[in-house]
Curated annotation (Swiss-Prot):
InterPro entries per UniProt: Aa-tRNA-synt_II, aa-tRNA-synth_II, aa-tRNA-synth_II/BPL/LPL, Asp-tRNA-ligase_1, Asp-tRNA-ligase_1_N, Asp/Asn-tRNA-synth_IIb, AspRS_core, GAD-like_sf
Highest taxon of the lineage: Bacteria
Location within or outside the cell: Cytoplasm
Annotated EC: 6.1.1.12
Coiled coil start-end: none
Official protein name in the record: Aspartate--tRNA ligase
Subunit structure: Homodimer.
Biological process per Gene Ontology, one example term: aspartyl-tRNA aminoacylation
PANTHER family membership: ASPARTATE--TRNA LIGASE, MITOCHONDRIAL (PTHR22594:SF5), ASPARTYL/LYSYL-TRNA SYNTHETASE (PTHR22594)
A GO molecular-function annotation: aspartate-tRNA ligase activity
Gene: aspS
Residue positions binding L-aspartate: 174, 220, 447, 488
Length: 587
């Protein structure tokens, strides 16, 4: 037996017991005739003591020679520490070591294996196996494990079956780019890695598996952000004989179960619901952060037509009221202006107005507006003395709202209104079924081609497709879309109509999705579902800024795994075996 206990379990109740521990040397300290070694494993850290007054000199000499991250086994007696460490669970005890074996030496690690490390992102990604030894990273993996267990426990209790679907599937042109896999046995043909198990879970509904789930890897070849990776994990679910209300109730229940069991937060009230239209109107985003208010107020009637050309020519003027921010200095306001003018935001500038202690309003465009008009602005914004009004305008309604959204989030962060330990959950519902692309002059499915329109909007498919609302819904927590889904189309004729509106010829629709259309001919039940992003849930509960920190071996922002150096070139023999030839990139 290599060990009798772990480095995180010994307490005062174990005093005088002889134990054997294994782990990695965190640090070595020498004080007089004593050497202290912090020994670490997955479970915690325990202090080892080598005392020259009671232990063999040869053993103490070897202890002094130990290096960081050496792997050792130590046997000794559990003793009470004279100088306790309240910061760790094992801080009341130490091990007086009588025997020690070095199981493996280590080179000096390229960065310190501590929560507060000196290693940069790139270096830690290259040596991810060392980064995973850090407690803060390891705890994210443990959180992920516990969440996956609770997901399975909840869904099993609700009668769901976990069914695995294929990883090598057919490529479809809609949505993000596919990762493709050449087939050696079928020259010139390719599989795709699934962006989601969407069509397979619908086929399972046709098969009679009325409640399905799986925790599944999905793949999308798209530009990366803090909340995106080329491969990610979904909690994928589907239900038969349900309406939207049934799906929302089931998965709101799962969210509450996770809050209760993982975060120990009890949520009794129902999640509020907001239409997509209201989310865009008041927050400029279909995933609004509702931890704080600061809703948009349209100001066209108040500010247009007063000789200020920027506003007079605008298609939209919107403002937010930052409560208590009237003390912002000119330097802070200039920094906010620079923020909205960054290419990532794209605004041309920002106008501000502050409400003074006497109720008067002082603005950055005073020469264009009378105090009477500024007081009307104050009333419209419901601003009080000490408040700050921030205003953006533009000639594109949706674009300007998105810019105002970025400003709102930035100000919310500056004012401490986005506490990671406070959670605000809601459903966003009634999405548009289609979105119009000006460049290609065609409709695209806002979610996917299998989303059902609201029954009362079906007649609009022939007259005004852009006005059709979808039976779709997203769960949003703290401005993060943690999951989304829809009621699916289960009628072949309606599905065919959907394909036509999306620009599919009957031949193309049959080529891409004929297997699903054929299945619908054999009695497809009404069905719907949802997919949660497990990575996003974990990062939310862990208070992380990026999902990368809750994935064991993530890719960097260029989609590369710098640890194993992937993607990489393959041998010419492999290319020939796959009947592939590389064309030089002239760029």
């Amino acid at each position: 037996m290599y060990r009798t206990n772990t480095c995180g379990e010994l307490r005062l109740s174990h005093l005088q017991q002889t134990v054997t521990l294994c782990g990695w040397v965190q640090r070595v300290r020498r004080m007089g005739g004593m050497t202290f070694v912090d020994l670490r494993d997955r479970y915690g850290t325990t202090q080892l003591v080598f005392n020259r007054d009671s232990a063999p000199a040869e053993l103490c000499d070897r202890a002094e020679d130990l290096g960081r991250e050496w792997v050792i086994r130590a046997t000794g007696t559990v003793m009470e520490r004279s100088s306790k460490n309240p910061n760790i669970p094992t801080g009341d005890i130490e091990i007086a070591v009588g025997e020690m074996d070095v199981l493996n030496r280590s080179e000096v690690p390229p960065f310190t294996i501590e929560d507060e490390t000196d290693g940069g992102d790139d270096l830690r990604m290259k040596y991810r196996y060392l980064d995973l030894r850090r407690h803060c990273v390891r705890s994210n993996m443990e959180l992920r494990h516990r969440m996956a267990l609770e997901v399975r426990k909840y869904l099993d209790g609700e009668g769901f079956l976990e069914v695995e679907t294929p990883m090598l599937i057919k490529s479809t042109p809609e949505g993000a780019r596919d990762f493709v896999v050449p087939s050696r046995m079928n020259p010139g043909q390719f599989y795709a890695l699934p962006q989601s198990p969407q069509t397979f879970k619908q086929l399972l509904m046709v098969s009679g598996f009325d409640r399905y789930f799986q925790i599944v890897k999905c793949f999308r070849d798209e530009d990366l952000r803090a909340d995106r990776q080329p491969e990610f994990t979904q909690i994928d679910c589907e239900m038969s004989f349900v309406e939207q209300e049934d799906v929302l109730s089931t998965f709101e229940g799962m969210a509450k179960h996770l809050f209760r069991t993982i975060r120990h937060v009890e949520i009794s009230e129902a999640f509020p619901r907001m239409t997509w239209h209201d989310a865009m109107k008041y927050y400029g985003s279909d995933k609004p952060d509702t931890r704080f208010d600061m809703r948009f107020v349209e100001l066209m009637d108040v500010l247009k037509g007063h000789g200020f050309s920027v506003f007079d020519s605008a298609a939209y003027i919107g403002g937010i009221c930052a409560k208590g921010a009237g003390s912002y200095t000119r330097k802070q306001l200039d920094a906010l202006t620079d923020f909205v003018k960054r290419p990532q935001v794209g605004a041309k500038g920002m106008v501000y107005a502050r409400v003074e202690s006497d109720g008067s309003v002082k603005s950055s465009v005073d020469k264009f507006y009378t105090q009477e008009t500024l007081q009307e602005l104050r009333r419209t914004m419901e601003a009080e003395p000490g408040d700050l009004i921030l205003i953006l305008s533009g000639d594109d309604l949706m674009k300007t709202r998105k810019q105002l959204c970025e400003l709102r989030l930035e100000v919310g962060s500056q004012l401490g209104l986005r506490d990671k330990n406070k959670f605000s959950c809601l459903w966003v519902v009634d999405f548009p079924l289609f979105e119009w692309d000006e460049e290609t002059k065609r409709f695209y499915a806002m979610h996917h081609p299998f989303t059902s329109p609201k029954p009362e909007d079906i007649p609009l498919l022939d007259t005004d497709p852009g006005a059709v609302r979808a039976n779709a819904y997203d769960m949003v927590i703290n401005g993060v879309e943690v999951g989304g889904g829809s009621i699916r189309i289960h009628d072949s004729a309606l599905q065919q109509k959907m394909f036509e509106l999306l620009g599919f010829t009957p031949e193309k629709a049959q080529e891409q999705f004929g297997f699903l259309m054929n299945a619908f001919k054999y009695g497809a039940p009404p069905h719907g579902g949802l997919a949660y992003g497990l990575d996003r849930w974990v990062s939310l509960f862990a208070g992380l800024d990026s999902i990368r920190d809750c994935i064991a071996f993530p890719k960097n922002n260029a989609g590369r795994d710098v640890m194993i150096d992937a993607p990489s070139v393959i041998d010419e023999a492999q290319l020939q075996e796959l009947f592939l030839e590389l064309i030089p990139n002239e760029n």
